[in-house]
Swiss-Prot record:
Motif (Nuclear localization signal): 336-340
Single Gene Ontology BP annotation: signal transduction
InterPro entries associated with the record: Ankyrin_rpt, Ankyrin_rpt-contain_sf, DEATH-like_dom_sf, Death_dom, Ig-like_fold, Ig_E-set, IPT_dom, IPT_NFkappaB
Alphabetical UniProt keywords: Activator, ANK repeat, Biological rhythms, Cytoplasm, DNA-binding, Nucleus, Repeat, Transcription, Transcription regulation
Keyword Repeat: yes
Protein name: Nuclear factor NF-kappa-B p100 subunit
Main localisation: nucleus
Entry's Gene Ontology molecular function annotations: DNA-binding transcription factor activity, RNA polymerase II-specific; RNA polymerase II cis-regulatory region sequence-specific DNA binding
Gene: NFKB2
Site residues by UniProt (Cleavage (when cotranslationally processed)): 439-440
Acyltransferase in keyword set: no
Biased segments, Low complexity type: 684-695
Subcellular location: Nucleus; Cytoplasm
Domain RHD: 34-223
Length: 906
């Protein structure tokens, strides 16, 4: 048997798998033609479920199984040389999972393997099949990875030569090893099979085209598990996208997973669900928002597919169906009610319509001066008077309030009942009297209306009908608001409120909408004011739990919101802190509406700028960061003072979200506003959840454990303990995710790393002020300071102060503004100190301004000035210390005055 190893094939151009002349000295041409010999894989290796092992763990319990291996029927990776009979040599080694395949740091071990990490089998002359039944994968540690890679690359270079490597070749090998270490995935390998046939000299040098197996995943790697969708809370959503879906799945890596939507047709449309690493909960649940469908307008539901997909490996789960439905433009059904066909009245008064007879004063009857027709109905009331009936109630009359006798009516219009009793006649008589009085009252109302032209005369006698509802549950007041009949609305309100103990003004329709809700939805501030002044209940909610404030903010209606907040009175605090059925407060909807003006109105009235929604505990700042709305986030942080370190129910701060989204601008904004870069959320860091950024860092706890065991000469535990067992045995607290652990952007990573390092001290600058001495100017103080600065001439005005505070770049910007001294806000925001401002004013001779800024100090701070500080050198009052600090110190030679040392703020 010829044990001379042929060159490794990593120098091959894998597009056509041809050898380079520098690798092999060919004695005969390759025997590969259309009908020549070739190598084929008969049984692929099993892709998942096989564990790579470290040296200290010993050999594997059984070799790498085949893809079709089952209990009771074992199979193993198998290859065959076709179109050839004779002796042949088949070698198998490990290569990377990416193309082109390159040498892998791991090695093969087993009975057929050598120290170089390759396995060899001799086949022929008849049976050309080779089965590798005892293959194992030896897992290299990151600590030893570099040396092993250089050794393998050296053997590859010198395999077919006996010469020594030059310095240039050694440097080239080291660079290649470093590059491979950066890109190589230690949890995935592939088998490369290469067949060698005998040449004329009897040596195995004629190489056939190599074949590469399917990827083999290390079973202990999170990426090795099969992707599976277990459950979703929604299977349908709007064609516009943006619907929030909760998806339960098997274990995934939060930085290597996406939710793919696609259509399996000729169009090939696909899109990804929108979520960040912070939306992946404990690696078993994903909260994502659906992408918009590629056709924004559809007339019927469309079914697509969704699946989980790994970004790096490309593995996918089984597909699930998802349905996009058309947009419901008129969700509140306002437009539908506006388009309803109204009854058509005849142009003449010839009668016949159930809405009124001829010659009569708007009665119900046969018309033409006809007779009265009052069929008895025991259920007569205002709720069924509007409903049409095959026997309409008649109450027509001629020229005056006259009615024919009941006996005459009975004789003319209907046949006498066969069974008539005294009680029945009495009941009928009472009913007829009631209708007669009603007709007389209506007639008088019509006469009064003819004299005064006031519609309220007609409505007053019909006020008991104001609570009647149509098939949608809408009252006359609902319909008047829907059709924006302002004059009718005023008249109906005046009539309705005159009913004692009435609640007609608060009646809801079938959509749980009150007239007040519809007035807000249809954007009629004047009507809303009328209803509120008529004591309509502003705290009632619609079917989605939305209050009046929610409805106004959903439409981003600043005018409506301003009017509501001005007239809600005692209900304002309750509504400002009332969530809807989705758990959103009004401040959250203001952020979603991208309206800083609405947000200012809410906060000014007492809304909590740090209020949390009920689903995930997000504040308005969390939502602004999720929306990547820099303007809104800046407004919340700088103007409204939102807490940049607030935490969701999962412990995520806005900085976690910004880092997860990979937004450098939002990250810088939050860090500048005081976000804690070391703040952790509630999810423990697992070995697989954090990717090691540096190739020189060995951050795998499992590998460190294995290496420590090898150094101590102790056998490693096998099988490997579960994460739950490791957590129980762990003594110290497990580290949780910081923003740095969640970012996928190198720019954001650099920003966070820089922020996490302590700033080097600057000798020429005073130490940063403590939190107790930070500058905080209210509007009154700023206006007072501006008046003092403008009283003096050049050299002591606000421009000179700006120069002394290092704000020279802002002088031209604020020069033409109504309040130039507001440039001090740019000194205040990054943490400018009160002491620095007082010293600058004192050096300009503005003692009055110094006294004004000192005056509003808190009582406890003034009391603290009387406290003496003891030391071994005596006692000195804090007041004297402050006076000494404010006194201009002598300037040494070569040093600039303090006014020129201030750091310039841009």
């Amino acid at each position: 048997m010829d044990e001379h190893f042929q060159p490794c094939l990593d120098g091959i151009d894998y597009d056509d798998f041809s050898f380079g002349s520098h690798m092999v000295e060919q004695k005969e041409p390759l025997m590969e033609t259309a009908v020549g010999p070739y190598l084929v894989i008969i049984e692929q290796p099993k892709q998942r479920g096989f564990r790579f092992r470290y040296v200290c763990e010993g050999p594997s319990h059984g070799g790498l199984p085949g893809a079709s291996s089952e209990k009771g029927h074992k199979t193993y990776p198998t290859v065959k040389i076709c179109n050839y009979e004779g002796m042949a040599r088949i070698e198998v080694d490990l290569v990377t999972h990416s193309d082109p395949p390159r040498v892998h740091a791991h090695s093969l071990v087993g009975k057929q393997c050598n120290e170089a990490g390759n396995c060899v089998a001799i086949v022929g002359p008849k049976d050309m099949t080779a089965q590798f039944s005892n293959l194992g994968v030896l897992h290299v540690t990151k600590k030893n990875m570099m040396e092993i890679m250089k050794e393998k690359l050296k053997k590859q270079k010198t395999r077919n030569t006996n010469g020594l490597l030059t310095e240039a070749e050694l440097r080239e090998i080291e660079l290649e090893a470093k590059e491979l270490k950066k890109v190589m995935d230690l949890s995935i390998v592939r088998l490369r099979f290469t067949a060698y046939l005998r040449d004329s000299s009897g040596n195995f040098t004629l190489a056939l085209q190599p074949v590469i197996s399917d990827p083999i995943h290390d079973s202990k790697s999170p990426g090795a598990s099969n992707l599976k969708i277990s459950r979703m809370d929604k299977t349908a959503g709007s064609v516009r996208g943006g619907d929030e879906v909760y998806l339960l799945c098997d274990k995934v890596q939060k930085d290597d997973i996406e939710v793919r939507f696609y259509e399996d047709d000729e169009n090939g449309w696909q899109a990804s669900g929108d979520f960040s690493p912070t939306d992946v909960h404990k690696q078993y649940a994903i909260v994502f928002r659906t992408p918009p469908y590629h056709k924004p307008k559809i007339d019927r539901p469309v079914t697509v597919f969704l699946q989980l997909k790994r970004k790096r490996g490309g593995d996918v789960s089984d597909s699930k169906q998802f349905t996009y439905y058309p947009v419901v433009e008129d969700k509140e059904e306002v437009e539908r009610n506006r388009k309803k066909v109204l009854p058509q009245f005849p142009q003449h008064f010839g009668g016949g319509s159930h809405m009124g007879g001829a010659g009569g004063a708007g009665g119900f009857g046969a018309g033409g001066g006809g007779n009265l027709s009052f069929p008895y109905s025991s259920g007569l009331g205002y709720n069924n008077l509007y409903s049409s009936s095959p026997h309409p109630v008649g109450c027509g009359y001629q020229g005056g309030v006259q009615m024919k006798a009941a006996s005459e009516r009975d004789g003319d219009d209907r046949q006498a009942p066969t069974e008539s009793t005294y009680c029945r006649e009495l009941q009928r008589h009472r009913h007829l009297c009631h209708l007669w009085l009603l007709a007389r009252r209506n007639a008088h109302a019509l006469l009064d209306y003819s004299v005064t032209a006031d519609p309220r005369m007609l409505l007053a006698v019909q006020r008991h009908l104001a609570a009647s509802q149509d098939e949608n549950g809408d009252t006359p007041l609902h319909l008047a608001i829907i059709h924006e009949q302002t004059a009718v609305i005023k008249q109906l309100i005046e009539v309705v409120v005159s009913i004692p103990s009435q609640q007609i003004i608060n009646i809801t329709n079938n959509l749980q909408q009150t007239p007040l809700h519809l007035a807000v939805i249809t954007k009629q501030p004047q009507v809303v004011q009328l209803l509120l002044e008529a004591h309509a209940n502003p705290t009632l909610l619609d079917r989605y739990g939305n209050s009046l404030l929610h409805l106004a903010l959903q439409a981003a209606d600043e005018e409506m919101l301003r009017m509501l907040l001005a007239h809600l009175a005692s209900a304002t605090p309750y509504l400002l802190h009332l969530p809807n059925f989705q758990g959103l407060l009004p401040v959250h909807l203001a952020v979603k509406a991208k309206s800083p003006a609405c947000l200012d109105l809410l906060v000014r009235k007492g809304a909590d700028v740090n209020g949390v929604e009920r689903q995930g505990g997000r504040t308005p700042l969390h939502l602004a960061v999720e929306m990547e709305n820099l303007n809104m986030a800046t407004h919340l942080v700088k103007k409204l003072g939102a807490n940049v370190n607030s935490r969701t129910f999962a412990g995520n701060t806005p900085l976690h979200l910004a880092a997860g989204l990979g937004s450098p601008t939002l990250t810088k904004l939050l860090l500048k506003a005081g976000a804690d870069v070391q703040r952790e959320n509630d999810e423990p860091v697992s070995p697989s959840s954090v990717r090691v950024p540096s190739s020189d860092t060995d951050g795998d706890p499992e590998e460190q454990e294995q290496e420590q065991a090898m150094e101590l000469g102790e056998p490693a535990l096998s099988p490997h303990p579960t994460p739950e067992e490791e957590q129980e045995e762990a003594g110290p607290r497990q580290r949780l995710h910081t923003a740095l652990d969640l970012t996928r952007s190198q720019k954001v990573r650099d920003i966070l790393l820089q922020a996490s390092q302590p700033s080097p001290p600057i000798l020429s600058c005073p130490p940063p002020p403590s939190r107790n001495h930070l500058l905080s100017l209210d509007t009154d103080a700023l206006q007072g300071l501006e008046q003092l600065l403008n009283q003096y001439g050049s050299g002591s005005d606000w421009m000179e102060l700006a120069k002394r505070l290092g704000l020279c770049s802002l002088v031209e910007t604020y020069k033409t503004t109504p309040s130039p001294a507001s440039a001090l806000r740019s000194y205040e925001l990054p943490g400018g100190s009160l002491g620095g401002l007082l010293e600058a004013l004192d050096s300009m001779g503005l003692r009055g301004a110094v006294r004004m800024l000192r005056k509003p100090e808190p009582l406890e701070k003034l009391q603290s000035t009387e406290v003496k500080e003891d030391s071994a050198y005596g006692s000195e009052s804090v007041e004297e210390e402050q006076a000494a600090r404010l006194k201009p110190r002598p300037v040494p030679e070569g040093e600039l005055p303090h006014s020129q040392q201030q750091q310039q703020v841009h």
